[in-house]
From Swiss-Prot:
Compartments where found: Cell inner membrane
Entry superkingdom: Bacteria
CDD domains on file: cpPDZ_EcRseP-like (cd23081), S2P-M50_PDZ_RseP-like (cd06163)
Family: Belongs to the peptidase M50B family.
Classification of source organism: Bacteria, Pseudomonadati, Campylobacterota, Epsilonproteobacteria, Campylobacterales
The protein's Enzyme Commission number: 3.4.24.-
Protein name per its UniProtKB record: Putative zinc metalloprotease Cj1068
A Pfam match: Peptidase_M50
Length: 368
């Protein structure tokens, strides 16, 4: 009962200080982790492995029910969850159980199947969320010109404020963000709408400084225009929604992988690493803005969760997959002491990253 009261107090404080959007954040994160664990659960059950515990949240159990040999729980802290398979214990890396319904007796390939199912469910969930988003539509900046920079390519050919860019080299432009994706240093054919009339221009962009997706200053082709602030509802319906979902899933996955590489190489400063507070802030703002934007952020976080869990770090799914690949290739298991050492090292790395990300979040809040 005390645990239940603690959970209620946490939620009340969250709603009081962050409004109802805080509750939306808790639900989003809990749902994504639930879906991740559901992947492991279904994969394990499909191979006859006993799932001893399926918990939504961590900590003391608030509500639990036994069904077909599995203990289903709702635990105190809703930001997380886990499944406990018979014969697998992350806190005791060397633990094994040789019963016929145990994870321990499975072949490496079957273990990889179970391990990969969690991240895969996150990626599939994101794909279907993008399909829903495409059909509902998402408000984005319209490709309408606001300010025009002096001596820019746009000024030189006579583009004007409130012109709407319709096409670049025959490619339809729906949002302002799409403009930069189709620029090059070669002459471009640009179709615009000005006061109801379509006009065509030949323009060669100039090199200028701008920011990439990671906040780095880079040189790239520019028109020299900014948006006028008008928004437009962009929809991708029917079969087009599947193409949109595939593109968004691929772009988000690529962005995450590039971000990890840049973080490791030092191209992106470690202070940019955000944690649960940043995630809560972003999700809460999305919930305030619109339901579709909340779905978009949910899809992005789901892909993050899927990709990050595949990193080859012990204690993550990717680390366990790596151990099993080693066993498949070399026909022997990772030595027990090495396995335990790497597992505890992985645990320390993850804990350090969580603490560092939280420190960054708090420093950013204090700085504001």
């Amino acid at each position: 009962m005390r645990s239940l009261l603690l959970l209620i107090v946490i939620l009340i404080l969250g709603i009081k200080f962050y409004s109802i959007e805080f509750l939306a954040t808790v639900l989003v994160i809990s749902f994504l982790i639930f879906f991740h664990e559901l992947g492991h659960f279904l994969a394990a059950r499909s191979l006859g492995v006993k799932v001893e515990v399926f918990s939504i949240g961590f900590g003391k159990s608030l509500i639990e029910r036994e069904f077909k040999g599995t203990n289903y729980r709702l635990s105190t802290l809703p930001l997380g969850g886990y499944v406990k398979l018979k014969g697998q214990d992350d806190m005791r890396p060397g633990f094994e159980n040789l019963d016929k319904d145990s994870y321990s007796i499975l072949s490496p390939l079957k273990k990889i199947y179970i391990l990969f199912a969690g991240p895969f469910f996150n990626l599939i969930l994101a794909f279907f969320l993008y399909i829903i988003i495409g059909n509902l539509g998402l408000n984005k900046l319209a490709p309408q010109i606001g300010n025009i920079a002096p001596n820019s390519a746009a000024q030189e050919i006579g583009l004007q404020k409130n012109d709407t860019i319709l096409e670049i080299n025959g490619i339809r432009i729906q949002t302002f963000d799409e403009i930069s994706k189709h620029l090059s240093l070669d002459p471009l054919k640009i179709l615009i709408n000005r006061e109801g009339k379509n006009l065509e221009f030949i323009l060669t962009p100039k090199i200028g400084q701008g920011y990439n997706d990671f906040g780095q200053i880079v040189e790239k082709p520019q028109l020299g225009v900014s948006p006028n602030g008008t928004s437009t509802l962009v929809k991708h319906q029917g079969l087009e929604s599947f193409k949109y979902a595939a593109q968004e899933s691929f772009q988000a996955s690529t962005l995450i992988i590039k971000g990890i590489v840049k973080l490791i190489s030092g191209e992106v400063e470690a202070k940019n690493l955000g944690g649960i507070i940043t995630m809560t802030e972003i999700t809460s703002k999305a919930a305030q803005n619109s339901f579709t934007l909340l779905l978009f952020i949910t899809a992005l976080i789901s892909i993050n969760l899927g990709i990050l869990n595949l990193l080859p770090i012990p204690m993550l799914d990717g680390g366990h997959i790596l151990f099993n690949l080693y066993e498949m290739i070399f026909r022997r298991k990772v030595p027990q002491r090495t396995f335990e050492y790497l597992s505890y090292t992985g645990m320390a790395i993850l804990l350090s990253l969580m603490l560092f990300a939280t420190y960054n979040d708090i420093s950013r809040i204090i700085g504001e």
